[in-house]
């Protein structure tokens, strides 16, 4: 299955001292890798706000040039609507929900989740924010932050 990287994964990639090994760890099956246009915006904003050095910026920009970037389109907007209404327990396509209270997601996370759903991609993340969507809209592969330590 092809994969979609959450923004937090790109942050770990940008910090890596062993880039190729880390990418192999994240993508052991050598699947196609994608990010959302939102992730690209988030990572560029982080680089500016956190004053990343040129080497770190160049590393992540070179990586982004080698992967697919999914832009906003009408299908993505529909997926966003489905996921947001599901997360708020207000999606008419569902009679029951496996969670008792609404799951408030950040808007950028909603866009990222929508890309995974629309494209049928496995989302690779360190966050718990997507857990309620797992096996409903897409699959999630969660990596614990401690698992990145050997690559720094």
Regions found by a protein language model. Give the residues of each.
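A generic structural signal for short hydrophobic patches within well-formed alpha-helices
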Residues: 10, 19, 40-43, 77, ...
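Active-site neighborhoods of divalent-metal-dependent phosphate/nucleic-acid chemistry enzymes
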Residues: 69-122
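Helix-adjacent hinge/juxtasegments
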Residues: 60, 64-72
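Short, well-structured N-terminal submotif of metal-dependent ribonuclease cores
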Residues: 1-36, 45-62, 152
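Generic structural signal for small/hydrophobic residues in well-ordered secondary structure
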Residues: 6-7, 43, 80, 116
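Short active-site oxyanion
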Residues: 1, 30-33, 66-68, 117-122
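General small-molecule cofactor/ligand-binding pocket signal
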Residues: 34, 70, 141-143
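Acidic, PIN/NYN-like endoribonuclease modules and their adjacent C-terminal/linker elements
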Residues: 113-152
């Amino acid at each position: 299955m092809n994969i979609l990287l959450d923004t937090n994964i790109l942050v770990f990639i940008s910090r890596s001292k062993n880039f190729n090994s880390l990418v192999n760890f994240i993508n052991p099956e050598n699947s196609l890798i994608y990010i959302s246009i939102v992730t690209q915006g988030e990572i560029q904003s982080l680089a500016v706000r956190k004053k990343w050095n040129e080497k770190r910026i160049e590393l992540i920009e070179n990586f982004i040039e080698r992967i697919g970037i999914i832009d906003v389109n009408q299908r993505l907007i529909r997926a966003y609507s489905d996921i947001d209404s599901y997360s708020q327990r207000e999606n008419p396509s569902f009679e029951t929900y496996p969670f008792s209270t609404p799951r408030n997601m950040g808007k950028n996370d909603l866009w990222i989740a929508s890309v995974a759903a629309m494209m049928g991609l496995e989302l690779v993340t360190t966050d718990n924010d997507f857990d309620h969507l797992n096996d409903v809209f897409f699959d999630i592969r969660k990596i614990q932050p401690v698992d990145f330590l050997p690559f720094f």
